[in-house]
Amino acid sequence: MKIAILYREEREKEGKFLKEKISKEHEVIEFGKANAPGRVTADLIVVVGGDGTVLKAAKKAADGTPMVGFKAGRLGFLTSYTLDEIDRFLEDLRNWNFREETRWFIQIESELGNHLALNDVTLERDLSGKMVEIEVEVEHHSSMWFFADGVVISTPTGSTAYSLSIGGPIIFPECEVLEISPIAPQFFLTRSVVIPSNFKVVVESQRDINMLVDGVLTGKTKRIEVKKSRRYVRILRPPEYDYVTVIRDKLGYGRRIE
C-alpha cells in the first residue's frame, strides 16, 4: 500500500516515528507538512497532529481518499489513534479492520475566490467594529435577517467546532444537513437553524466583514454563496469507535452524574 504521512509543523519528530514504523510494511511515498501546497495522491493518508492538521490535510487529498489521524493536539475529534497505538493501527490496517466515515466539504464562492471548508465558513465583524445586519437566504425560502456579530455556516463535521461554542447543536456526522448559527445576536430568541445539505445558502452583510474558512482568515467580503461540494474524504476509525462516547468523553455531553 502506498501511504502519505502529513504532519503538523511542530510534530516532525512524531511523524518520523510513524514513518519508521509504517515503512516496515508499506511504501511511504510522501512525507511532509500538512500545510504545504499541492495535492496528495496515495492509497492512504496518515495525519499527525490535531483537528486543524486534519482539516489542512483533507484539502490536499484526492476525492474519497481514506485518512487516519494520530492525535498530537488537544480535543482530536478527527483523529482516531494515539502514537502509542501504532502497533494496533498496523494490525487494523493489515486486516482493513476499520469503521469508515464519509466527511464532505462545503464550497464557498465570493469575490475572494472559491474555497472549500470541511468544518465551516464564518462571516464576522472586526473586533473594533459594530454589529452588522446580515441577510441569510436559504434556497426555495424567503430571507432571514440577523443583527449580530456574524454568522457561521457549518457542516456536521463543524458542528462540534465554532458552532458549538455559540450555542449550536451537535450533529452526527452521518447527517446530510447544514447548520446556520448567528454569532452573539441582538435578540435572545435568535438560534441556530438546520437545513438540508442540498439547499444553497446566500449570506450578505451591509458592509465588508471578515471571512474565515475553517478558522483561517481569507479577507473581507460582503457576500458569499455556500453549497455542498462533491468533494469528500473518508475518515478511518477503530472498529469499536463510538461517536457518543467521543462527545461524552471530550465534551462531557450526556455524562451520567454519579
From Swiss-Prot:
<keyword id="KW-0963">Cytoplasm</keyword>
<dbReference type="GO" id="GO:0046872">
    <property type="term" value="F:metal ion binding"/>
</dbReference>
<dbReference type="GO" id="GO:0019674">
    <property type="term" value="P:NAD metabolic process"/>
</dbReference>
<feature type="binding site">
    <location>
        <position position="56"/>
    </location>
    <ligand>
        <name>NAD(+)</name>
    </ligand>
</feature>
<feature type="binding site">
    <location>
        <position position="149"/>
    </location>
    <ligand>
        <name>NAD(+)</name>
    </ligand>
</feature>
<keyword id="KW-0808">Transferase</keyword>
<keyword id="KW-0067">ATP-binding</keyword>
<comment type="similarity">
    <text>Belongs to the NAD kinase family.</text>
</comment>
<dbReference type="InterPro" id="IPR016064">
    <property type="entry name" value="NAD/diacylglycerol_kinase_sf"/>
</dbReference>
<feature type="binding site">
    <location>
        <position position="130"/>
    </location>
    <ligand>
        <name>NAD(+)</name>
    </ligand>
</feature>
<feature type="active site" description="Proton acceptor">
    <location>
        <position position="51"/>
    </location>
</feature>
<feature type="binding site">
    <location>
        <begin position="51"/>
        <end position="52"/>
    </location>
    <ligand>
        <name>NAD(+)</name>
    </ligand>
</feature>
<dbReference type="InterPro" id="IPR017438">
    <property type="entry name" value="ATP-NAD_kinase_N"/>
</dbReference>
<dbReference type="GO" id="GO:0005737">
    <property type="term" value="C:cytoplasm"/>
</dbReference>
<dbReference type="InterPro" id="IPR002504">
    <property type="entry name" value="NADK"/>
</dbReference>
<feature type="binding site">
    <location>
        <begin position="160"/>
        <end position="165"/>
    </location>
    <ligand>
        <name>NAD(+)</name>
    </ligand>
</feature>
<protein>
    <recommendedName>
        <fullName>NAD kinase</fullName>
        <ecNumber>2.7.1.23</ecNumber>
    </recommendedName>
</protein>
<dbReference type="GO" id="GO:0006741">
    <property type="term" value="P:NADP biosynthetic process"/>
</dbReference>
<keyword id="KW-0547">Nucleotide-binding</keyword>
<keyword id="KW-0520">NAD</keyword>
<dbReference type="InterPro" id="IPR017437">
    <property type="entry name" value="ATP-NAD_kinase_PpnK-typ_C"/>
</dbReference>
<feature type="binding site">
    <location>
        <position position="184"/>
    </location>
    <ligand>
        <name>NAD(+)</name>
    </ligand>
</feature>
<feature type="binding site">
    <location>
        <begin position="119"/>
        <end position="120"/>
    </location>
    <ligand>
        <name>NAD(+)</name>
    </ligand>
</feature>
<dbReference type="Pfam" id="PF20143">
    <property type="entry name" value="NAD_kinase_C"/>
</dbReference>
<comment type="function">
    <text>Involved in the regulation of the intracellular balance of NAD and NADP, and is a key enzyme in the biosynthesis of NADP. Catalyzes specifically the phosphorylation on 2'-hydroxyl of the adenosine moiety of NAD to yield NADP.</text>
</comment>
<dbReference type="GO" id="GO:0051287">
    <property type="term" value="F:NAD binding"/>
</dbReference>
<keyword id="KW-0521">NADP</keyword>
<dbReference type="GO" id="GO:0005524">
    <property type="term" value="F:ATP binding"/>
</dbReference>
<dbReference type="GO" id="GO:0003951">
    <property type="term" value="F:NAD+ kinase activity"/>
</dbReference>
<keyword id="KW-0418">Kinase</keyword>
<dbReference type="Pfam" id="PF01513">
    <property type="entry name" value="NAD_kinase"/>
</dbReference>
